[in-house]
Amino acid sequence: MKTLLVLALLLLSVSVQAKVYDRCEFARILKKSGMDGYRGVSLANWVCLAKWESDFNTKAINHNVGSTDYGIFQINSRYWCNDGKTPKAVNACHISCKVLLDDDLSQDIECAKRVVRDPLGVKAWVAWRAHCQNKDVSQYIRGCKL
């Protein structure tokens, strides 16, 4: 019985571990998903954004006053996803915030595309404005076999 309990705890700990992408692996996924140049945002800018928002961690969560940011792109629960806790959430991406925490980036990418279609575009991300805007971001994809 004790062995089963230890095994169950080990399996549980494995299932909740985050996927932390290598920058080049992440860049390849974005490129394959049509993100390079999407709405004028270069692949290097997307990679820079994710580096500074989550350090490429799919399980990144940051709590703000009145909302929470989720996943590799730090999608906000006030405007883009539904976490069931944020009052008056818009949920413009029509998704649960939980799906932004798994290793499948397809919904994260689709929601990020939705964010940049809004008037603010990529400027919606504070980390992008602080670390990527008007900077040489080529280093974020340098050496990647794209």
UniProtKB/Swiss-Prot annotation:
SUPFAM superfamilies: Lysozyme-like (SSF53955). GO terms for cellular component: extracellular region. InterPro entries: Glyco_hydro_22, Glyco_hydro_22_CS, Glyco_hydro_22_lys, Lysozyme-like_dom_sf. Gene3D superfamilies: 1.10.530.10. Disulfide bonds join C24-C144, C48-C132, C81-C97, C93-C111. GO terms for biological process: defense response to Gram-negative bacterium; defense response to Gram-positive bacterium; digestion; killing of cells of another organism. It catalyses: Hydrolysis of (1->4)-beta-linkages between N-acetylmuramic acid and N-acetyl-D-glucosamine residues in a peptidoglycan and between N-acetyl-D-glucosamine residues in chitodextrins. It is an enzyme of class 3 (hydrolase). Residues 1-18 form the signal peptide. Transmembrane segments: none annotated. Pfam families: Lys. Keywords: Antimicrobial, Bacteriolytic enzyme, Digestion, Disulfide bond, Glycosidase, Hydrolase, Secreted, Signal. Its EC number is 3.2.1.17. Belongs to the glycosyl hydrolase 22 family. This is Lysozyme C-2. It comes from Sus scrofa (Pig).
